Design a protein with these regions (language model features):
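Short amphipathic helix-loop junctions that connect adjacent transmembrane helices
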Residues: 28-45, 233-239
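Juxtamembrane intracellular "pre-TM" segments in multi-pass secondary transporters
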Residues: 1-4, 187-217
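Helix-loop-helix hairpin linking two adjacent transmembrane segments in secondary transporters
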Residues: 139-182
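Conserved MFS/SLC helix-loop-helix module at the cytosolic interface between two early adjacent transmembrane helices
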Residues: 61-93
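Extracytoplasmic gate region of multi-pass secondary transporters
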Residues: 26-27, 214-239
Length: 239
């Protein structure tokens, strides 16, 4: 039975689309901020860093909450809800008139962006034990593809159609991902129920109390910092 493979391919495709949506603005966000009234390059660089970084930050903070909801409601329903709200907030960015409005919407995108651990949990749930390394590798590759193709896609669309057009494109892409979940993903239920009396903060504290987990988190932070740190200011430097 290869039905589990179809679900994995779907989850990985959703991950690519979601990654493109969240990270794709990096290639043009400083220039868009100038269109919103920030003509000083120093201010534009600062706001670009804040606007670009707040979304991944909120994704990291909100992921435990959405993972818990996936245990309660089922991963299919939660992922559809996340993608629907993400579609609305990304599309709304095209109508922003001030940097603060853009920052608020980017923050909301991060709050509802915690679909990565849900996808990972689905893969672990449905994949045969001897195929888990392959499935995990494919999922990690899809995350990298989103990081690679997002800025490229955002920059190309912004160059051709203006700085507001990519938000419409990313919103439509998120909508397609949501429809893919609706039509192609079966209803699944995680086998292990989470103790509702345990808060997300206590769970985070527990995992961070493990030395190897702290080391892994630190290494991942430094790697991602090195890869994406220059992204918000690179368009200004090239300009």
């Amino acid at each position: 039975d290869s039905s589990w493979k179809r679900i994995i391919y779907l989850i990985c495709t959703i991950q690519v689309g979601g990654g493109i949506t969240i990270i794709g603005v990096i290639s043009f966000i400083p220039l868009f901020l100038a269109e919103l009234g920030l003509h000083d390059q120093g201010q534009a660089a600062m706001w670009a860093g804040i606007v670009s970084g707040v979304t991944p930050l909120m994704v990291a903070l909100s992921a435990p909450y959405w993972s818990r909801k996936a245990n309660q409601w089922g991963p299919r329903k939660v992922m559809m809800l996340i993608l629907f709200i993400l579609m609305i907030t990304v599309g709304a960015c095209a109508f922003t008139q001030t940097p603060m409005q853009l920052l608020i919407l980017r923050t909301l995108q991060g709050v509802v962006g915690g679909y990565v651990p849900i996808g990972l949990a689905i893969i672990v749930l449905i994949t045969p034990e001897n195929k888990v390394p392959w499935a995990m590798g494919l999922y990690q590759a899809s995350m990298v593809m989103g990081l690679v193709f997002g800025p490229l896609m955002g920059g190309l669309v912004a160059d051709l159609l203006g700085y507001r057009a990519p938000f419409f494109v990313f919103s439509a892409l998120t909508g397609i991902c949501m429809l893919g979940i609706y039509f192609l993903m079966p209803n699944l239920q995680f086998k292990h129920k989470v103790d509702e009396s345990v808060s997300e903060i206590s769970l985070i504290k527990y995992f961070l109390s493990i030395p190897r987990v702290r080391l892994l988190v630190g290494m991942l932070f430094l790697c991602n910092f090195g890869i994406t740190g220059i992204g918000p200011i690179l368009p200004l430097y090239i300009k």
